[in-house]
Amino acid sequence: MEKEKEKRYQRVDEIQSALLAMASVTPTAGIAAAKVPDTKKILEAAWKKSIAVLPFSNLSPEKEQEYFCDGLSEEIINALSHIGELRVAARTSAFAFKGKDIDIREVGEKLNVGAVLEGSVRKSGQRLRITAQLVNVEDGYHLWSGQFDREMKDIFDIQEEISLTIVDHLKLKLLKSEKERILKRATENHEAYDCYLKGRYFWNRRYEKGFQRGLQYFQQAIEKDPGYALAHLGIADTFGYLGNFSFLPSHQAWSRAEAASKKALEIDPELAEASATLGWIAMWYDWDWTAAEGHYLKAIQTKPEYDTAHLWYGLYLSIVGRFDESIQEMQKARELAPLEPVNPTLVGWALYVARRFDEAIGELRKVIESDPQFAIAYWYLAASCLAKKMWGEGIVTIQKFVELSGESVIAVSNLGYAYASAGMRDEALKILERLDRLSKDRYVGSLWRAAVYLGLGEKNEALENLGKAYLERESILACIKVWPAFDSLRSEPRFKALLKKMNLD
């Protein structure tokens, strides 16, 4: 293999594509067929250089140590993802097996990996006992197993030992820069690290109270180590989602998200996740489409296996109307994280805004079949049904979204739009009253009122509320160029002017 990084294949799928192309070429006269590479053997070798890191089991006396077990697995995933020769299953896909009694070979088959790392943690005070096993998916035998009886202060040494042992047993060749990245510690403060793990644990629950608790822990981590880039990124991601899900007014949320992202990149310029978050901010708050694309492409270039960067870039492409590219990019995210429900869900969104409603419905029904609790899939499925005037299914589906989301503003507003679109005017007006009541103890964006008025056919009220949403800089307004629900406004001068102000004309 080439020693110079720029001449090497950077990902396993690039190797596969090249080999398949070579295999399709018939040897020319005078060239021995024996010189054509044995594609099957080389593809098998590439498959063996792939791994899933399952969440470590919690054997601690205190069951609240779950956050530490999840965090340890996630940190090992992050370390291994810096190795260009190794394909690492995304966290969300690996964590789909959490708490399930499933054969390792089945895990390997579902995630298309050649090896699986599993383990357990027993934590008592400052004492740790960590066990780890590296299993060959092909035959189920252990390639390696180890036990670490250490103090909490040694956690970073343990992570490095496990990561480098995997490199050794999978016979991977590390570039100097890759090894440096594995050994580079985000913090030397184990108390800050512990706070960060707690923050991510609650953040990953993806609901308002979880975001708020996560934010507290990220802030504690920074108090203990101001130079902890990942903790700054945690704050950025938290405020980004609080703004995006309308839990906070945009002006409050996004400026804090941007400041924290820039701080994270200042500390660690190679942090792909921070670049992606800056793209997220440029897209949802700044409405700076050129900057957003640049940030996403930088994140993908820095970390090609980062499925979220591909997903967010695909979402960006759908918002600006580049539908075919959007679906293609989201499919890349799905390939990298096949068990993450948000990936096929946003494929469904992209099909919906591309007016491919039947395909969207098929895609989203499959998501719900595999994960009936994944709330956002019900929103996009309902929207696709309503676009086809399937009023009954649309209303029932959005009612399920309201239930699963805990009566979120987004869900309640969409129920009002569904009632109005189906001609159920009285029910839609009651939803407007319900939004007024909700606004007494939570933020209710003007766009969500506009959606109900739009369903009622009251264009003037809808446009007035869209104007307020622009002044409030509500993030979801970024979608109006392509959102089918707003098609009835496209000939309106005020709507055209709004698109122009957002650089979406």
Q: Which residues are covered by each model-predicted region?
A:
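Terminal, low-structured helical/coil segments at or just beyond the last alpha-helical repeat
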Residues: I480-D505
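TPR/TPR-like (Sel1-like) alpha-helical repeat modules
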Residues: G467-E474, N503
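Amphipathic alpha-helical protein-interaction segments enriched in hydrophobic
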Residues: V409-N414, Y443-L454, A478
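Short, ordered coil/turn segments that flank beta-strands lining enzyme active or ligand-binding pockets
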Residues: K5, V137-D139, L197, G455, ...
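Post-kinase regulatory C-tail/linker adjacent to protein kinase catalytic domains
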Residues: A29-I42
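C-terminal lobe helix-coil module of Hanks-type protein kinase domains
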Residues: M1-P27
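Residue-level recognition of oxygen-bearing side chains
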Residues: E14, E325, E359, E461, ...
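Acidic, proline/glycine-rich low-complexity intrinsically disordered segments
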Residues: T39-A411, L415, Y419, M424, ...
